[in-house]
UniProtKB/Swiss-Prot annotation:
Annotated S-S bridges: none
The protein's name: Ribose-5-phosphate isomerase A
Catalytic activity: aldehydo-D-ribose 5-phosphate = D-ribulose 5-phosphate
Residues engaged in binding substrate: S40, G41, S42, T43, D96, G97, A98, D99, K110, G111, G112, G113, K137
A GO CC annotation given for this chain: cytosol
Class in the EC hierarchy, top level: isomerase
GO-annotated biological processes: D-ribose metabolic process; pentose-phosphate shunt, non-oxidative branch
PANTHER family named in the record: RIBOSE-5-PHOSPHATE ISOMERASE
Keyword Isomerase among UniProt keywords: yes
Length: 239
């Protein structure tokens, strides 16, 4: 008798295969004795799993710096030794995913999973920051399809909303799934998603962070390289 497909069964998609392709490629970039920033999200999790396989098979001496509770759990399961940011001194390489990648500037929007604050700290402190994406994440200009997430201190959420409205953006408090009320980050803050067009990523990143009450935003203007999974190969984009 055939098994009835359940609503929560995961069916692999073309996007999933492209994510796995870039994850495998990225894992090969890690060298012995490196400290590696471990990003968060579906693509980053695949990278973490592939890196764990390399550590076991090749007996590599590597430490990972997780950017969320989720990446910490995935890394622990994969057998990657973990170290905190204040213990490592420096990070050799950070590997992370993205929600949008601007093809011309390699600026990013991240934070669909609400982890962008810790991701940005780790990614920006790394000597090299590499992003993994499937070709569907490439855009001509940031903000066309994906909102910019802001991590906001709960005390200031209403004033931040008012400020964003005055800037002619369309802000919305991110609601949780599986619970009533707003999404709460690993650091205990709220997420406001902002729909806006972005002409200059660096200026927008600075402007949003200058709003009192905003801890960090999901515009990443700094990225060294992007590995893009396509149906034919993994393309490498550089500035």
């Amino acid at each position: 008798m055939a098994r009835t497909k359940k609503a929560n069964d995961e069916v692999p998609t073309d996007s999933d295969s492209l994510k796995l392709k870039v994850a495998k490629q990225a894992a090969k970039l890690v060298k012995d004795e490196m400290v590696v920033g471990l990003g968060s999200g579906s693509t980053a999790n695949l990278f973490i799993q592939e890196l764990g396989k390399r550590i076991v098979e090749e007996e590599l001496y590597i430490y990972g710096v997780p950017t969320s509770f989720d990446s910490r759990m995935v890394a622990s399961t994969a057998g990657i030794p973990l170290i905190s940011l204040d213990q490592c001194g420096e990070i050799d390489l950070a590997i992370d995913g993205a929600d949008e990648v601007c093809k011309s500037t390699l600026a990013l929007i991240k934070g669909g999973g609400g982890c962008h604050t810790m991701e940005k700290i780790v990614d920006y402190y790394a000597k090299e920051f590499i992003v993994l994406a499937d070709e569907g994440k490439l855009v001509d200009s940031l903000g066309d399809k994906t909102p910019v997430p802001l991590e906001v201190i709960p005390f200031a959420y209403s004033t931040v909303l008012n400020k964003l409205l005055k800037l002619n953006t369309a802000p919305a408090i991110r609601s949780g799934s599986g619970k009533m009320g707003p999404v709460i980050t690993d650091s205990g803050n709220m997420i406001i998603d902002v729909f806006m067009s972005i002409e200059d990523a660096e200026e927008t990143e600075i402007m949003l962070n200058n709003i009192p009450g905003v801890l960090e935003n999901g515009v990443f203007s700094k990225c060294d390289k992007v590995l893009v999974g396509t149906s034919k190969k993994v393309e490498i984009l550089k500035k």
